[in-house]
């Protein structure tokens, strides 16, 4: 009798045993839930698959994710396109490549012709730059030939894009991934009666600019003059006169004056990626207070961040690279300016938008188990899930007036992270506490044991739980019964797998994607009971 009771009692079910028939085994051997198709695709679009995980190599992780996307496109291409466009329009993802791959799969392989056409119609919106278009073409070409729909879809981009935008592509994005603008034009054969547009397209193909009087062609005219520049000063003057991007200037004259001019002629994305180069050539230094102040004002301007489509991960990556004083590949060194490092931290927070507090009692639980120290989040070199969890938790910790941050693996212990911590100190604290296997029930069990009043549990994890004797969903029910309150559980997934400890059928549990720019406000609304 006792054995039978034990067998059916969920309180006696460890995480290595299935709690119900909806659970599946994760990569660590524990049983969890699978997220919905929409949630899994969103994870792929936001987090990508670069770097693998502790339990799955980069290659296996990539194959699993891309196989899922392929299968979803065959089964419900309309859903795949809707989710992709939602992420793109909301500026929720740090990289465009996952969205470009999904769009290429729909455009080339969707069973329904209407879905394929819809994907091609969306191409100008998703491939916003010349680089993105060439990346898309590399994906699309690998999936099939150049039929009528493909030729028409690519031609449409060149026929409808603003001429000044095309002219910028002609000098800034000449070739990527084995594809050039000339290659695309020779295959697509766009047609137009617009003389300025035809002039740009001809220049893309053969490098010759016809004599057409149009302001849109000035960037190409300036580029042609810059190719003849013999000095840094001459090239810098042309950049300012013609508003040239850095790529329009030959590499042998890219000295300090050219980089100083580039600060005025290039956007915020360029600035984030080139802070180290600005320091390397002597433009951004502690002694140049005017330049430092100008950089800080741009980095901390909320409107400029939104206008420049700066994702929080862009700012975090820039901070990680710039603060270490040398490039990711070891090329070039510089002296980081502390005020610029602080501005990048502020930019990280501002890039999430105006996050409102839920004003509920939050327990922020960071998974610091061994698996969280492996792999790179969203392809950012050196940004482990462990560090990403600490960075994400700081947003909630600085927003919510009543929040506590703890770390868990097989046990639960304080991390000492406070709202006053910098990104670096918070990530260091999380890294220094890394230990043991993963038991995602620990935060809830600890709160019940300590009789701590919690309205919202937020668990930052890779969902590879396996080491506990109680499933997290059961622990939440036990807590509610013991404390006489109905808490909510938010799971912030930091790897692009299909797993979650949150039961998708329960209204008191929510699974969100780590580093989704929309995540903090969605979490607030859920904690308030608004969704």
UniProtKB/Swiss-Prot annotation:
A divalent metal cation binds at residues 369, 371, 438. Keywords: Cytoplasm, Metal-binding, Ribonucleoprotein, RNA-binding. InterPro entries: Ro_60_kDa, TROVE2, TROVE_dom, TROVE_dom_sf, vWA_Ro60, vWFA_dom_sf. Residues 24-360 form the TROVE domain. It comes from the Bacteria. Residues 352-531 are annotated as: VWFA-like domain. One of its GO terms (molecular function) is metal ion binding. Forms oligomers upon binding DrY RNA, The multimers are of an average size of 700 kDa and are composed of around 12 molecules of Rsr-DrY RNA. This is RNA-binding protein RO60. The lineage of its organism: Bacteria, Thermotogati, Deinococcota, Deinococci, Deinococcales. The gene is rsr.
């Amino acid at each position: 009798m006792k054995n039978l009771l034990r067998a059916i009692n969920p309180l006696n079910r460890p995480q290595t045993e299935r709690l119900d028939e909806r659970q599946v085994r994760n990569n660590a051997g524990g049983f969890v839930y699978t997220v919905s198709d929409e949630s899994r695709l969103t994870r792929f679009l936001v987090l990508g698959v670069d770097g693998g995980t502790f339990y799955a190599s980069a290659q296996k992780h990539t194959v699993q994710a891309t196989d899922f996307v392929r299968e979803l496109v065959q089964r419900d291409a309309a859903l795949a396109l809707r989710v992709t466009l939602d992420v793109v329009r909301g500026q929720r993802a740090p990289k465009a490549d996952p969205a470009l791959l999904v769009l290429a799969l729909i455009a080339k392989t969707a069973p329904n012709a209407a879905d394929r056409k819809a994907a091609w119609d969306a191409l100008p919106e998703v491939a916003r730059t010349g680089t993105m278009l060439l990346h898309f073409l590399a994906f699309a070409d690998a999936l099939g030939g150049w039929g009528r729909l493909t030729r028409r879809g690519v031609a449409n981009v060149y026929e409808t894009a603003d001429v000044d935008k095309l002219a910028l592509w002609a000098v800034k994005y000449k070739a990527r991934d084995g594809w050039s603008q000339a290659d695309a034009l020779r295959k697509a054969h766009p047609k137009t009666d617009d003389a300025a547009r035809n002039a740009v397209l001809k220049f893309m193909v053969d490098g010759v600019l016809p004599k057409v009087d149009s302001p849109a062609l000035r960037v190409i005219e300036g580029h042609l003059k810059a190719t003849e520049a013999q000095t840094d000063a001459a090239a810098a003057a042309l950049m300012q006169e013609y508003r040239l991007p850095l790529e329009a200037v030959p590499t042998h004259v890219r000295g300090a004056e050219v980089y100083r001019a580039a600060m005025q002629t290039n956007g915020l994305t360029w600035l984030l990626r080139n802070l180290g180069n600005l320091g390397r050539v002597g433009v951004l230094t502690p002694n140049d207070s005017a330049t430092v102040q100008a950089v800080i004002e741009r980095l901390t301007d909320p409107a400029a961040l939104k206008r420049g489509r700066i994702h929080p991960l862009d700012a975090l990556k820039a901070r990680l690279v710039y603060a270490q004083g040398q490039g990711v590949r070891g090329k070039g060194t510089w002296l980081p300016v502390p005020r610029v490092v602080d501005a990048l931290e502020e930019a990280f927070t501002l890039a999430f938008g105006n996050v409102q507090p839920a004003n509920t009692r939050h327990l922020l639980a960071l998974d610091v188990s061994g698996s969280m120290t492996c792999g790179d989040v969203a392809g950012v070199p050196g940004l482990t899930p462990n560090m990403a969890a600490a960075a994400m938790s700081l947003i909630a910790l600085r927003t919510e007036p009543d929040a506590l941050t703890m770390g868990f693996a097989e046990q639960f212990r304080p991390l000492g992270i406070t709202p006053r911590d910098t990104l670096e100190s918070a990530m260091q604290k999380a890294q220094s506490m890394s230990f043991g296997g993963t038991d995602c029930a620990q935060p809830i069990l600890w709160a019940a044991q300590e009789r701590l009043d919690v309205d919202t549990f937020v668990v930052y994890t890779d969902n590879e739980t396996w080491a506990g004797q109680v499933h997290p969903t059961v622990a939440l029910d036990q807590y509610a019964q013991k404390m006489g309150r109905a808490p909510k559980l938010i799971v912030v997934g930091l790897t692009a797998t299909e797993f979650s400890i949150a039961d998708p059928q329960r209204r008191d549990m929510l699974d969100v994607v780590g580093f989704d720019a929309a995540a903090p406000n969605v979490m607030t609304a859920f904690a308030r009971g608004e969704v």
